[in-house]
Design a protein with these regions (language model features):
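Active-site loops and adjacent core secondary-structure elements that bind or stabilize anionic groups
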Residues: 10-11
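N-terminal leader/propeptide and maturation segments of large enzyme subunits in energy/redox metabolism
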Residues: 20-104, 168-177
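Active-site-adjacent bridging/hinge elements
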Residues: 71-77, 109-124
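A general structural signal for short secondary-structure junctions and capping/turn motifs
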Residues: 17-22, 268-272
Length: 301
């Protein structure tokens, strides 16, 4: 992407990518790599794990609609959230979500092939095509920070719905490590979350025996996901956008860009072969002086 035209650049960690994809690979969807002419991807969007965590706390009842959406597991009834209890309930709720997620995607891909098989595009790919089954995670850093807050600080339910009794808001007392600061206490939770979700996806049958993958990526959908997600134990307010991709939660990174990227690099790429996205905004002057007279625009013939 040309920085002088649109003001943004996409940097790819080629050294890591080549190990899996070889020299001749392409970015087929946002941050998803593929061996050119040899593979195709069944697109998978994202699962809102932030909302899944709230479902785990509230026994499958949606905080925004007050409707029973997930399975009616026993909710957390104590006012102080206990880490082991919340993680156990969250793990069980992720099982339900992964099963629903993969089943819906299988249906979509089957019906798409049935009614709109992309023959023209497939003609450009090898006969024995390798198929990957993409999935994704939204709300990644908010889940990590919420679990970290429950583990290392004191999180209490500060408001309950008078009709359903579900938790509506949380109060956090004390400090806690946050993802994006090169702190292993938070980053270890991030690694656990990624592996746990991928393992659950891999247990399900995927359409045409495609290889299950996952990503930590949102482009603008984090805004919509956030609109329908309630208050989080990490302090994020209901209705506000989720942090994009594998970015730290808004305002959580306190140790600078390198610390944020160090947290990112602890996430094993082989567990997120559909891609890991980290979006940074910075003042151009932070990169050093730029001589605009030396910028050249591309020529399109």
């Amino acid at each position: 992407i040309c920085a002088c035209l649109v003001g943004s650049e996409m940097c790819i960690r080629d050294r890591v990518m080549k190990v899996t994809w070889g020299d001749d690979y392409s970015i087929c969807c946002c941050v998803s790599a593929t061996q050119t002419g040899k593979e195709m991807q069944f697109f998978g969007a994202r699962a809102n794990l932030a909302k899944c965590l709230l479902y785990a706390i509230n026994g499958g009842v949606d905080m925004k609609s007050k409707v029973q959406v997930g399975p009616a597991y026993k909710p957390v009834t104590s006012d102080v959230l206990e880490y082991d209890e919340v993680v156990a309930k969250f793990d069980k709720m992720m099982d339900w979500l992964a099963d629903l997620y993969v089943n819906v995607l299988n249906l979509i891909h089957y019906m798409h092939d049935k009614y709109y098989y992309e023959a023209a595009e497939m003609a450009l790919i090898d006969t024995d095509v390798k198929r990957t089954f993409a999935t994704g995670i939204a709300g990644f850093s908010h889940v990590v920070d919420s679990l970290s807050a429950i583990k290392y600080a004191k999180v209490t339910v500060s408001e309950r719905d008078p009709e359903t009794g579900i938790a509506m808001a949380f109060k956090t007392e004390g400090d806690f490590p946050k993802y994006g600061n090169d702190d292993d206490r938070a980053d270890d939770i991030a690694v656990w979350l990624l592996k746990s979700f991928l393992d659950k996806i891999k247990k399900r049958h995927t359409y045409r025996n495609s290889e299950p993958t996952t990503s930590i990526l949102t482009i603008t959908s984090n805004v919509v996901y956030g609109k329908f997600t309630g208050n989080m134990p990490d302090g994020r307010k209901a209705g506000t956008p989720l942090a994009p991709g594998a970015n730290p939660s808004y305002g959580a990174e306190q140790n600078g860009l390198l610390a944020s990227l160090n947290s990112l690099t602890k996430l094993p790429y082989e567990w997120a072969l559909d891609g890991i996205s980290n979006t940074q905004t910075m003042n151009p002057d932070a990169l050093g002086p730029v001589s605009y007279t030396h910028l050249t625009l591309p020529t399109i013939a």
